[in-house]
Every structure is written in C-alpha cells, then in structure tokens.
From Swiss-Prot:
Membrane topology label: Multi-pass membrane protein
GO CC aspect terms: chloroplast envelope; chloroplast outer membrane; etioplast membrane; mitochondrion; pore complex
UniProt function note: Voltage-dependent rectifying anion channel that facilitates the translocation between chloroplast and cytoplasm of phosphorylated carbohydrates such as triosephosphate, 3-phosphoglycerate and inorganic phosphate (Pi) depending of ATP to triosephosphate ratio in the plastidial intermembrane space; in high triosephosphate/ATP conditions (e.g. photosynthesis), export of triosphosphate from chloroplast (outward rectifying channels), but in high ATP/triosephosphate conditions (e.g. dark phase), import of phosphosolutes (inward rectifying channels).
Protein name per Swiss-Prot or TrEMBL: Outer envelope pore protein 21B, chloroplastic
Ranges annotated as spanning the membrane: 22-31, 56-65, 72-81, 88-97, 111-120, 128-137, 143-152, 159-167
GO terms assigned for molecular function: porin activity; voltage-gated monoatomic anion channel activity
InterPro entries according to UniProt: OEP21 (IPR034575)
GO BP: regulation of monoatomic anion transport
Gene that produces this protein: OEP21B
Family statement: Belongs to the plastid outer envelope porin OEP21 (TC 1.B.29) family.
Phylogenetic placement of the source organism: Eukaryota, Viridiplantae, Streptophyta, Embryophyta, Tracheophyta
Organism listed in the record: Arabidopsis thaliana (Mouse-ear cress)
Keywords, in A-Z order: Chloroplast, Ion transport, Membrane, Plastid, Plastid outer membrane, Porin, Transmembrane, Transmembrane beta strand, Transport
Length: 167
C-alpha cells in the first residue's frame, strides 16, 4: 500500500492518503484510494477505479466510481497519452484528461492538460528529480510540479499549491 501525507493551500489540516493497486492482469489493475482528513478525523473521499495501460500506444485509461463527502457519488473516466520527446523517454509530452459524471448524468469538474515532463535520474547520488510544466485547459492556468524522491510540490499561476510526502 502506498501512503502519503498531503497539505494544500486551501486546507487547514493535513490529509493522509492511501492507495492500493490490485493486479488484474499484466496491463490492468484495480486501484483503490482514499483520504483521511486529520482535522475532522473523517474520510474526505474514496475511489475505486479499473485502470488499463496500452503499452504499444503509451496510453492509459481508467474508469471508476468516486465518493466525496461534498459531491457524493460520481462516475469518472480518465485518460493519458504520452509522446516521447527523446528516445530514452526521459522527456515526454503528455496529454491527459478527466471527466466526472454525477448521479444525474451531469458533467462535473472536467480536466484536460498538456504538459512536458522531464525525469532526471541520479540528479545527485540516490536522488531522482521530475519536473513537469503544463497548461490546464478548462481552468486556463499554467502549472508546474517538482518531485524529488518522496517530496512533491504542485503549484499553479492562480496561487494554488499542494505539498505531498510519500511515506
């Protein structure tokens, strides 16, 4: 099980996130993940999703259900396509999108982004770094991510940010 501690610019409490991937076959897994709000002591959300990877097309697709304490039960579909910029795939151009559909079949929170990702292995001894720079199409905002081993910082040009530490 993967666990992390998360803190965002619009939250007053730390969140504990847990994720488990249960293999179905070599290209498909069931992904279960949820979050506990340490301020309230209650779960923030829970999600179950079937994810499939198409290696010949460098593409991933996921379909699942998401329960949120505010927006209740939703169905979601997400996809990502990766285009290598370099032959070693350390620099990629990614297109990704997500669509949530509520119980009344209304589309909620659409997301779509184009980004460049640069993976720097052994930046220093035992230190890997990933830098992402992208543009979120629906929110119309540039964003960036810097990841160093267990630490991840995400920020956008509207002043929103979040920090994650993988345990």
């Amino acid at each position: 099980m993967e666990t992390s501690m998360r803190y965002t610019s619009n939250s007053k409490s730390m969140k504990i996130h847990a994720k488990e991937k249960v293999p179905v076959n070599s290209k498909t897994h069931l992904q279960l993940h949820g979050e506990l709000d340490t301020g309230t002591g209650a779960p923030s959300y829970f999600c179950a999703m079937i994810r499939h990877f198409f290696p010949e097309a460098s593409t991933g697709l996921g379909v699942g259900l998401h329960y949120d304490k505010r927006q209740k039960l939703r169905c979601l579909v997400r996809g990502k396509k990766e285009f290598p910029v370099r032959a070693d795939k350390r620099v990629t151009f990614n297109i990704k999108g997500r669509c949530d559909i509520d119980q009344d079949l209304n589309q909620k929170n659409p997301k779509g982004a184009a980004e460049f990702a640069w993976n720097i292995m052994d930046f220093k001894e035992d230190q890997d770094v990933r830098i992402k720079v992208g543009y979120e199409m629906f929110d119309k905002v540039p964003y960036m991510q810097i990841r160093e081993n267990n630490w991840t910082l995400n920020a956008n040009m509207k002043g929103k940010w979040n920090l994650r530490y993988d345990l």
